[in-house]
Curated annotation (Swiss-Prot):
Claim: ATP-binding is one of the keywords in the record: yes
Listed InterPro entries: His_synth_HisIE, HisE, PRA-CH, PRib-ATP_PPHydrolase-like, PRib_AMP_CycHydrolase_dom, PRib_AMP_CycHydrolase_sf
A GO term, aspect molecular function: phosphoribosyl-ATP diphosphatase activity
Protein name as annotated: Histidine biosynthesis bifunctional protein HisIE
Phosphoribosyl-ATP pyrophosphohydrolase, as annotated region: 126-214
EC number: 3.5.4.19, 3.6.1.31
HAMAP family: HisE, HisI, HisIE
GO cellular component: cytoplasm
Taxonomic lineage of the native organism: Bacteria, Bacillati, Cyanobacteriota, Cyanophyceae, Acaryochloridales
Family matches, as SUPFAM superfamilies: all-alpha NTP pyrophosphatases, HisI-like
NCBIfam families: histidine_hisI, PRK00051.1, PRK02759.1
Amino acid sequence: MPATALSLPLDEIRYDERGLVPAIVQDYLDGTVLMLAWMNRESLQKTLETGRTWFWSRSRQELWPKGETSGHVQWVKSIRYDCDSDALLLTVEQVGHIACHTGERSCFHRHGAKGESIEPPPADTLSQVYNIVCQRRDFPQLQSYTSSLFTAGDNKILKKLGEETAEVVMACKDDDPEAIASEVADLFYHTLVALAYHRVSLRQVYEQLQLRRR
């Protein structure tokens, strides 16, 4: 889906001696850094006009629209430039949730002296826990409490949600900050289990939260 109208003072952007400016691309919902690419004035102009990311390929010496062959288009939500006007930050909706040509979500998936490939770090703990919950759903483990909830089914999960909600209320009534934090964490966890059970992604929840930012 195309982004809303974008604007940027092109004449204020400071390009290097090659006419390029680095562009950091970030997921607009959870903040994950997806990639670093390069733009020139023309690619930036096309990005503003089309609402999708266009970059300059230094190896091929040509413009390229992200997702041209893979279909993993990036719809731009916002473009910012830094205090020196020589770097860009784009927040995007990443189609297919894959930004890297290797098939990884983020291009920043390598770590260590040997550059071994690892799972890119999630942007927040909630995402990390949700990913683990989904793994326990899809690949059950005998000794896993999370897996046992999925095995027990929806009624068990909903019962736990009700119990945890009541415990949050009681902790708040007691005005116990430490207990409140602990009980809310339990509630968040069981809510994530319910989301995973019903195949609702955190992205869908984030989108609804965006509508409530008033």
